[in-house]
């Protein structure tokens, strides 16, 4: 199993690479690429950790050597948020980066499962899809927007609020991966109940958690460590699905035939072909139904922006 991380010298990329080096199955290959010249050194640094995962690093303008034979590609390249920016401010820089990297994936590893971490995910996934379509290699079951950070934040915040063991908390988060498009389905959590005020406050905190980190870091960065953990969880789930493990389910932003939008985050069953099945997200409360319907204009505009960028 070969996993490639593009943007591996960045804050998310280094955290993700460290976690993958320690958690990928034995005899996996980990391939690190970044434009930054430090990248081969990141690989050497990681190679001193005693796990049966081979690490190689590649720097420069062309990621193709890192992508050869990749089964999974995780793309975290791009600029990070700074105070006062929202995820859409990142679009102008990150859109071109994602387009160029996905073009290389299409040419070098067209069958790989591609996880897009680079924000704004609502838009960059649509860009990736259009690039893959133009290359004639688009498979909707092999492209994912990584929204796992919204899931782990939801699970953490709910466990804190209710005094639960976080390992026992599972939360589906649907919609997209920015602001109002992030919708945790708190009504579905077994064994807990929330007041209307708690639901509103928790939902808002989950939606704005990225900003919470950006402001707390006082201009020194964004959510890199928690995002690295979230991306590792999702990447390992992709690997487990490819290896034939049963019942691997994660939420992700996919082209899954949703009635709501061309791309929509919801639970998916992972397998040897990527998405084996898009799962129904189940019954929702009145608050959740209203929030879902209210987000759709924003979400569809984000998607349209990505489609038009490529065309």
UniProtKB/Swiss-Prot annotation:
UniProt function note: Catalyzes the reversible oxidation of malate to oxaloacetate.
Class of enzymatic activity (EC top level): oxidoreductase
Catalytic activity field: (S)-malate + NAD(+) = oxaloacetate + NADH + H(+)
One GO BP annotation of this record: tricarboxylic acid cycle
Positions with a binding annotation for NAD(+): 7-13, 34, 94, 117-119, 227
Name of the protein in question: Malate dehydrogenase
Keywords of this entry: NAD, Oxidoreductase, Tricarboxylic acid cycle
Residues involved in substrate binding: 81, 87, 119, 153
Domain of life, per lineage: Bacteria
InterPro entries: L-lactate/malate_DH, Lactate/malate_DH_C, Lactate/malate_DH_N, Lactate_DH/Glyco_Ohase_4_C, Malate_DH_AS, Malate_DH_type1, Malate_DH_type1_bac, NAD(P)-bd_dom_sf
Record note on quaternary structure: Homodimer.
Catalytic residues of the enzyme: 177
Cellular component GO terms held in the UniProt record: cytoplasm
UniProt-listed CDD domains: MDH_glyoxysomal_mitochondrial
EC identifiers of the protein: 1.1.1.37
Pfam families: Ldh_1_C, Ldh_1_N
Organism, scientific name: Shewanella woodyi (strain ATCC 51908 / MS32)
Protein family according to the UniProt entry: Belongs to the LDH/MDH superfamily. MDH type 1 family.
UniProt-listed PANTHER family: MALATE AND LACTATE DEHYDROGENASE, MALATE DEHYDROGENASE, MITOCHONDRIAL
């Amino acid at each position: 199993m070969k996993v490639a991380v593009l943007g591996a010298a960045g804050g998310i990329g280094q955290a993700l690479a460290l976690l993958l080096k320690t958690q990928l199955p034995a005899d996996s290959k980990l391939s690190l690429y970044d434009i930054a010249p430090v990248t081969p050194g990141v690989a050497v640094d990681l190679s001193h950790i005693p796990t049966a995962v081979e690490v190689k690093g590649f720097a420069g303008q062309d990621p193709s050597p890192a992508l050869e034979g990749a089964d999974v590609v995780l793309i975290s390249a791009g600029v990070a948020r700074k105070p006062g920016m929202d995820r859409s401010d990142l679009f102008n820089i990150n859109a071109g980066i994602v387009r160029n990297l996905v073009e290389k994936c299409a040419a070098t590893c067209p069958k790989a499962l591609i996880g897009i971490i680079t924000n704004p995910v609502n838009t960059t996934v649509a860009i990736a899809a259009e690039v893959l379509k133009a290359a004639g290699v688009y498979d909707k079951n092999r492209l994912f927007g990584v929204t796992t950070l919204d899931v782990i934040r939801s699970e953490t915040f709910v466990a804190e609020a209710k005094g639960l063991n976080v390992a026992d908390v599972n939360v589906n988060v649907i919609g997209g991966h920015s602001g109002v498009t992030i919708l945790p389905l708190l009504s579905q959590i077994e064994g807990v109940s929330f007041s209307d005020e708690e639901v509103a406050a928790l939902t808002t905190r989950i939606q704005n958690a990225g900003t919470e980190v950006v402001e707390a870091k006082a201009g020194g960065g964004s959510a890199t460590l928690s995002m690295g953990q979230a991306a590792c969880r999702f990447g390992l789930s992709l690997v487990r699905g490819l290896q034939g493990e049963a019942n691997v389910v994660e939420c992700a932003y996919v082209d899954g035939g949703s009635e709501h939008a061309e791309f929509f985050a919801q639970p998916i069953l992972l397998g040897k072909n990527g998405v084996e099945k898009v799962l129904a997200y189940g019954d929702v409360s009145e608050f959740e139904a209203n929030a879902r319907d209210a987000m759709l204009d924003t979400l569809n505009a984000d998607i349209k922006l990505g489609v038009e960028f490529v065309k």
